[in-house]
Amino acid sequence: MVPVIALVGRPNVGKSTLFNRLTKSRDAIVAEYAGLTRDRQYGEARWQGRTYIVIDTGGISGDEEGIDAKMAEQSLQAIEEADAVLFLVDSRAGMTAADQMIAEHLRKRNKRSFLIANKVDTIDPDLARAEFSPLGLGDALPIAAAHGRGINHMLQEALGIFPKDNAEEEGEGEPASEEVAEGEEPTRIPGPSEKDGIKIAIIGRPNVGKSTLVNRMLGEERVIVYDQAGTTRDSIYIPFERNEEKYTLIDTAGVRRRGKIFEAVEKFSVVKTLQAIQDANVVIFVMDAREGVVEHDLNLLGFVLETGRALVIALNKWDGMEAAERDYVKTELERRLLFVDFADIHFISALHGTGVGHLYKSVQESFRSAVTRWPTSRLTSILEDAVQVHQPPMVNGRRIKLRYAHLGGANPPLIVIHGNQVDAVPKAYTRYLEKTYRRVLKLVGTPIRIEYKGGENPYEGKKNSLTARQVNKKRRLMSHHKKAEKKKKDKRR
């Protein structure tokens, strides 16, 4: 499971700066959930091949009122959600009463905490350690978040307490370094979780019907092997079989009664949702048809797209809607979900079971598309045909040349294209290639990533040194050129 690390501390100690420093590899703040998780931001970060989730929180000063009290409450909640806490203090300002209050809270919660002395760029780190030693959280780790100093050592300490899971040890996703022999049929790359079948995460906003859908999927022709509580925050992993196919449902909805439909007010945990997406092969994204597409839906869909997981969209509570309402919702889906137009959309009623059975076909097709590998000859042939139909643009009077393509990874499919001037390939042309590969390979429900690699210039970075013979020749040419110029000037006079 992906570790979750919370950044806490009083205001203006550099939490947001450190958050941006840690998440810059993905260059994104995943989501801001106003009203649900006020002033908590969730980001995904990577360090030395390891993925982890960072929670940025509001400052805690101990004298909050009104909205500030709400922000402090959310910061304390982030501590409960996290697997480890990075407690930031300001080395320049020294220890304060607020620092002591937060340290006392962390000690009481018995949470694995690391004391981080920020802003040591102008202060002796040893002095900072001595200053904050009375907090009783061990030696402070000195960093300068603004300049990136001490970050690697800090992450080594913080992430070192978590065991690496199999996916991290084998590399992210399913690498496809092993080539398919020319002429072979495309094959499926077995994933590390194949013994549990396809892992399906049911995600969505609160009260869109996730619990009802889970119960409905388990209640139809089910053979439940066992219910196993997840290791983190009540996520439930439920292996089951349907039509001799193995699946594992990852239920993030919380309260659920097996055997009967039970729709409670769902406890929404961003951490649970993000971890479920990371651990799944396919995500079923549940939306409320009566509410349409809202901003929270787009935030979560953006994270699914960023992680590269296969996607199926289920529009729940479709029954009982008037024809005009349905037409409006379909128009909104076409307009606002263009960035995930590769995903199948199902209109269902989890309560009555309408359309639920069709989800399995889309799940299987999406998974198959995400983990299939293709030979280099096939991918190159598709590239050549695409270039012949629509050539890349000219750059500085020269045509971009795309020479060949091969598979660089799976889940999601990564197609590596080699050529010249590939840094100048426009995004619009990349989208054209993505759609071409999707259409020809008949890929459904999975994003495609295209990576370009240019040819290496063996003389790049080397100074052009002339031989003695070349130097003499250059001098003669320059001398001849000067004499010719002088004759021209004399004639003009």
Swiss-Prot record:
Keywords: GTP-binding, Nucleotide-binding, Repeat, Ribosome biogenesis. The keyword Nucleotide-binding applies. Gene3D superfamilies: 3.30.300.20, P-loop containing nucleotide triphosphate hydrolases. The keyword Repeat applies. CDD domains: EngA1, EngA2. Residues 471-493 have a biased composition (Basic residues). GO terms for molecular function: GTP binding; ribosome binding. One of its GO terms (biological process) is ribosome biogenesis. SUPFAM superfamilies: P-loop containing nucleoside triphosphate hydrolases (SSF52540). Residues 166-195, 454-493 are annotated as: Disordered. Residues 372-456 form the KH-like domain. InterPro entries: G_ENGA (IPR031166), GTP-bd (IPR006073), GTPase_Der (IPR016484), KH_dom-like (IPR032859), KH_dom-like_a/b (IPR015946), P-loop_NTPase (IPR027417), Small_GTP-bd (IPR005225). Residues 454-463 have a biased composition (Basic and acidic residues). NCBIfam families: GTPase_EngA, small_GTP. Associates with the 50S ribosomal subunit. This is GTPase Der.
